[in-house]
Curated annotation (Swiss-Prot):
Identification of the protein by name: Serine hydroxymethyltransferase
Gene encoding the protein: glyA
Enzyme class, broadest EC rank: transferase
Location within or outside the cell: Cytoplasm
Cited function: Catalyzes the reversible interconversion of serine and glycine with tetrahydrofolate (THF) serving as the one-carbon carrier. This reaction serves as the major source of one-carbon groups required for the biosynthesis of purines, thymidylate, methionine, and other important biomolecules. Also exhibits THF-independent aldolase activity toward beta-hydroxyamino acids, producing glycine and aldehydes, via a retro-aldol mechanism.
Binding site for (6S)-5,6,7,8-tetrahydrofolate: L115, G119, H120, L121, S348, P349, F350
PTM-bearing positions, type N6-(pyridoxal phosphate)lysine: K224
GO CC terms of this entry: cytosol
Stored Gene3D superfamilies: Aspartate Aminotransferase, domain 1, Type I PLP-dependent aspartate aminotransferase-like (Major domain)
Similarity remark: Belongs to the SHMT family.
Residue intervals passing through the bilayer: none
Pfam families for the chain: SHMT
PANTHER family: SERINE HYDROXYMETHYLTRANSFERASE (PTHR11680), SERINE HYDROXYMETHYLTRANSFERASE 1 (PTHR11680:SF35)
Amino acid sequence: MLAKTDPVINDLIKQEENRQRHNIELIASENIVSGAVQEAQGSVLTNKYAEGYPNKRFYGGCEYIDQIETLAIERAKELFGADHVNVQPHSGSQANMAVYQALLEPGDKILGMNLTDGGHLTHGSPFNFSGQLYDFYSYGVADTNEQLDYASLAAKAQEVHPKMIVAGASAYSRTIDFPRLREIADQVGAYLMIDMAHIAGLVATGVHPSPVPYADVVTTTTHKTLRGPRGGMILCKAEYAKAIDSAIFPGIQGGPLEHVIAAKAVAFGEALQPEFTAYTKQIVANAQAMAAVFDQSDLVRVVSGGTDNHLMLLDLTNSGLNGKELQNLLDSVHITVNKNTIPFEKLSPFKTSGIRIGTPAITSRGFKEKDCEQIANLILEVIEKHDQLEAMTAISEAVLKLTDQFPITQAKFLD
């Protein structure tokens, strides 16, 4: 139908589908949803308006919508052990915005992770609403090991006395010590909000410790390692439920995207299966296999010396390339990464000294450790031989052979 109604859009979708099939996707925030998740999101639920919450709607005809949203909520509660869950946020950024609005006043002091050290725009960037509406102070990693500097964070908290401490990251490869963060927050009487967007899938299966018992509020996206549709979610203690729900609706959103919420419910159901635990363990094993290869090279340096989760940062200082240059070179041989700042960055965010690499999407295709070691070696080969046409052609052919070997439609962890 789409091909007939709008052939231009249809053709572009087909081209994107072809790109995904024939590229090795290493962007840490991307994944490949199951056919069931995709089917739910493309359903007739997109036709339905449902302002409000289950059994408290401002529109009629929501009897099935209520059941679907309730299922999403209950599955998320089971998955993460949360008192209360709101599945309506359209994105992780909107989930974070709602938490700030629910618990803070404009101008309140917040302590968040420095973007350069691995934080997120919504954790206080001056270019983001968070840094414009609230008085953010930053903490980061230690210069000795590039891991979170909890002592420095605690000292900063004592100095600033923030009303909230925000933790979680978009480019941090190590396990986060949530009990320590709770202790620091309690010492200054601050709320503790954890943004677990990147590690939610790992948390769901116990591969990464859970922030839920320690945080007042936890926000997340529902894609990335959780392998659901693009969207957001908030988990909180029961005492904050009313404030959080009111901040989402009518605070910052109107009608929820019920077709996306249905897809979230499906993804949560998938994450409750034993196969998903095996999948998340493989994500980490694959990332560690890649990091081990990079760690043996003189061309790159693995930030913090390794990874405990799904991603790693590579310092390209010794390679003669910046992040943007390597991103473009890898694109030319069908490997997708993103340029990324590294701790104590010296280049602009439009160039960067590093790249970020993640394994969720390739693990969804069925890649194992040996395959990931091969990918790492291909990346090193691009760095070393990027000015040799014959070598780059051979690398491109090797990548296409791998993507043919692990087609998306036959991915091990998909239906």
